[in-house]
Curated annotation (Swiss-Prot):
The lineage of its organism: Eukaryota, Metazoa, Chordata, Craniata, Vertebrata. The keyword DNA-binding does not apply. GO terms for cellular component: centriole; centrosome; ciliary basal body; ciliary transition fiber; cytosol; mitochondrial intermembrane space; motile cilium; non-motile cilium. Residues 94-107 have a biased composition (Polar residues). Residues 75-89, 137-161 have a biased composition (Basic and acidic residues). Residues 50-62, 181-190 have a biased composition (Low complexity). This is Centrosomal protein of 89 kDa. It comes from Mus musculus (Mouse). Required for ciliogenesis. Also plays a role in mitochondrial metabolism where it may modulate complex IV activity. Residues 30-45 have a biased composition (Pro residues). One of its GO terms (biological process) is mitochondrial cytochrome c oxidase assembly.
Length: 791
């Protein structure tokens, strides 16, 4: 059945997404308006509202039927609110609540209606009068959704090596502590897990108990359905936050992998340095072998070689000393200001003549600079050792966290399996929300255009009326000026008359004078009467204009208040749309970041594969070099054995590192393959579901259009029937009144048989009286049956 909208009541549910609004709510209103009865703002449970009495009173006064509203539940208590908060507690890594499956969508005989503007919040003052059947079905479906919402899929960052067919499934009531914040405290995470499990079990029991109560009790009011939808939206918000946490966790895992890669690269560099040292040792051994092979070696040559070697060592030592001194001097120069030319000229530095001073030759004089340099090197060594210890502790903590993660995943595997339908349904709902948002934005734009047009028309009317007022005021002022001028003319005429009287006293006779005076008096009286009549007319016009002005001012104030209310509603809707747009943009950015991180991980893997290939090539070359060296090392057995032992150890280490790198690469390849397969499957399923939902929406829209057309046809037919019945009723009454008047004029005293006839005619009149309310009741029953067939 179609949802009609209530108005002038502020909604309590301000957190439900407006995208759940169906297309039926956007349909045009019926031709005959239905006004609901007045309601008290705070109804008490001891004094229920008599909606039936209010409906009867409204029908008797207006002659129109009214849909009787549902009885509202009393406000929730603190215990109910606490139960709802417990029910809405969801553990991390839960993707979406379990909604209906596609089979249930196809097999359902009736689709439940979505919430109206009363449940959607937004601060819009609109109510919805839902019928009993729709509210019952809506409450049952919502309880089913909440009951199934206990099961949810999990995205696991540290996944074990499992075949794609053997995918792990998780349960929603498994404990998930804060892995990012409390990574070091593994022992303290057991107690909150117990409490979270108890809360979830308690919420599940509450849900089951309320389900049983729903079957026992009569269907709930729209407030219960609104509360359920509010809880559902809170669950979806929590799950969006959990998705954000998952992205953060994946980012940290990628960082850990990058750290491991850098550590592997450092280890490879160390191995390369060690190999270079081994090559140098081998070269020295070759040189010693060549020297031993030479037969004509004299002790003088050996002494010369020793001296040359000593000189080389001394030269290298002096170079190192010069380097250290340069470093220390550069630091000193950066710390202190350089000397000016005048100051440097007064300083007695190197002597121009004579031998070199001893402090330039002897190393003892340079000891303070060397000591300072060595102190700085020791400080750096201490810092490096401290950082190494911190890295070791950090590695231990990371290993503990990984162990905890694996233990938790093992516990999750022991739980019951869950389907993967929640994530699909959430994304389809998000797409539907976007479509509904677009439709609502278009409607808002249309309403804004209509409001602007009405405002402009109102302003034009006001401007016209003000112009008329200005013109009338100008007319009144002109007439007042004319009156003043006429009075002045009268005064001048009176003065002239007096002068003429004075002049004509001696000339004119008394009879002539009296006749002239009488004529003048009659003229004056006529003029005064005309002036008084004109003044009365002008005063009446002024009063009428003042009344019109007051009424126009009242209308202007009412229109201004309406415009303000409409502007406030528009601002609220704009703010809500901005909020949801910002949330959508943030989620898009997070998805783009996750995709970028995946691409960087792919690049890292490619680099690792290249490094592994280079390592294998170097290993082959090293093996070849080792074989060559073994063939050349028969002379000096002890040194060759030591070198072979070192090479064996290094090869074992290299093999161990290579095995570790190969294992890690295999794990990463396996995880990436699983993720790609999951993403491909999910994308295909999402596309199928989107197509299915589009088909369902088109079918429902067609059904709604047909039902609206039938409703309009029925209303037109009912109006025609009502008009015809009213005409017949009037005609019958006029005929009966005419016959009664004729009989009363013919016979003043009627016999008993005429009385009987009159009584029978009156009974017939009463029996055949046709009431307008009966026809309207029939119309309402027809509308209700039509609405139920549509639902």
């Amino acid at each position: 059945m179609l949802l009609s909208f209530r108005r002038n009541r502020r909604s309590q549910f301000n957190h439900i997404i407006h995208g759940f609004l169906p297309a039926a709510s956007i349909a045009p209103k019926p031709a005959v308006p239905r006004t609901p009865p007045p309601r008290s703002p705070n109804p008490s449970p001891e004094r229920p509202r008599s909606a039936l009495a209010a409906a009867i009173l409204a029908t008797t006064l207006t002659g129109q039927t009214v849909a009787i509203p549902q009885p509202r539940q009393r406000s929730r208590s603190e215990s109910d609110a606490s139960d709802i908060e417990k029910d809405s507690f969801i553990k991390p890594y839960a993707t979406t609540s379990e909604l209906r499956l596609r089979q249930s969508w196809q097999n359902e005989p009736r689709r439940t209606s979505l919430p109206s503007f009363e449940m959607l919040g937004y601060g819009e003052d609109e109510d919805a009068e839902t019928q009993v059947s729709t509210s019952c079905r809506e409450s049952e479906s919502t309880w089913k959704d909440v009951g199934d919402g206990r099961d949810a899929t999990y995205t696991v960052p540290h996944r074990d090596q499992v075949l794609p067919s053997q995918k792990l499934v998780r349960k929603d009531d498994a404990p998930q502590p804060d892995w990012l914040s409390d990574s070091s405290s593994s022992s303290s995470s057991s107690t909150p897990q117990h409490t979270q499990q108890k809360d979830v079990k308690h919420s599940v029991l509450n849900l089951e108990g309320e389900k049983v109560r729903l079957h026992e009790k009569p269907p709930p009011s729209p407030d219960v359905a609104g509360r359920i939808h509010q809880r559902y939206t809170e669950i979806t918000k929590e799950k969006f936050a959990e998705l954000k946490e998952e992205t953060v966790h994946l980012y940290s895992a990628n960082q850990a992998l990058s750290c491991e890669l850098s550590a592997l690269r450092q280890a490879m560099k160390d191995l390369q340095l060690k190999l270079k040292l081994v090559e140098k040792d081998n070269r020295k051994l070759k040189e010693t072998e060549k020297a031993s092979c030479q037969e004509g070696v004299t002790p003088e040559l050996l002494c010369l070689r020793k001296q040359s070697q000593d000189l080389v060592d001394e030269n290298e030592g002096l170079k190192m000393i010069v380097h250290r001194l340069n470093v220390e001097l550069s630091r000193y120069q950066t710390k202190f200001r350089p000397l000016s030319e005048e100051e440097s000229s007064h300083i007695q530095g190197l002597p121009s003549k004579g031998p070199t001073p001893p402090w330039l030759v002897d190393i003892k004089y340079l000891s303070p600079l060397l000591l300072a340099y060595e102190d700085r090197m020791k400080e750096k060594d201490k810092l490096s050792t401290a950082l190494e210890e911190e890295m070791k502790t950090f590695r231990l903590r990371v290993q503990e966290v990984v162990k905890e993660n694996e233990a938790l995943h093992q516990e999750l595997t022991k739980r019951s399996p869950v389907t993967v339908e929640e994530w699909r349904q959430l994304q389809t709902q998000a797409e539907l929300v976007l479509d509904e948002n677009k439709l609502l934005i278009e409607q808002l734009e249309i309403q804004q255009a209509k409001a602007r047009d009405t405002h402009q028309a109102h302003l034009q009317d006001v401007s016209k009326l003000t112009k008329q007022l200005v013109l009338l005021e100008a007319k009144t002022q002109g007439q007042e000026k004319q009156l003043v001028e006429s009075t002045e003319q009268l005064e001048s005429l009176q003065a002239k008359c007096t002068e003429l009287k004075a002049q004509l006293d001696s000339k004119i006779a008394v009879d002539v004078h009296t006749s002239i005076v009488n004529e003048l008096k009659s003229q004056l009286q006529k003029e005064e009467e005309k002036d008084s009549a004109e003044m009365e007319e002008l005063m009446a016009k002024l009063t009428a204009l003042q009344v019109q002005k007051k009424s126009l001012l009242l209308e202007k104030s009412s229109w201004a208040t309406r415009n303000r209310a409409l502007e406030a509603e528009l601002e609220r809707t704009r703010k809500a749309n901005r909020r949801y747009q910002k949330r959508i943009d943030v989620l898009r950015k997070q998805v783009e970041k996750a995709m970028g991180k995946e691409m960087s991980a792919h690049q890292y893997l490619a680099n690792l594969v290249g490094l592994a290939e280079t390592v294998t090539k170097e290993r082959d070359s090293l093996k070849y070099l080792a074989q060559c060296l073994e063939s050349e090392k028969h002379g000096v057995l002890n040194k060759i054995l030591k070198g072979n032992i070192r090479l064996g150890k290094l090869e074992e280490r290299v093999k161990g590192y290579k095995k570790q790198a190969a294992l890690k690469l295999g794990d990463i390849h396996h995880r990436l393959k699983e993720q790609q397969e999951d993403f491909a499957g999910k994308a295909a399923q999402y596309q199928k579901e989107v197509k299915h939902l589009h088909r369902m929406l088109q079918e429902k829209q067609e059904v709604l259009d047909e039902a609206l057309q039938q409703k309009r046809n029925m209303e037109g037919e009912l109006e025609m029937v009502l008009e015809s019945t009213a005409k017949e009723n009037r005609r019958m009454r006029s005929l009966l009144q005419a016959t009664l008047e004729r009989r009363s004029t013919q016979h003043v005293t009627a016999p008993p048989d005429t009385c009987l006839r009159r009584s029978s005619q009156g009974d017939l009149l009463i029996g055949h009286d046709f009431s307008y309310g009966d026809v309207q009741l029939l119309a309402t029953t027809n509308r209700q049956s039509l609405g139920e067939s549509m639902a």
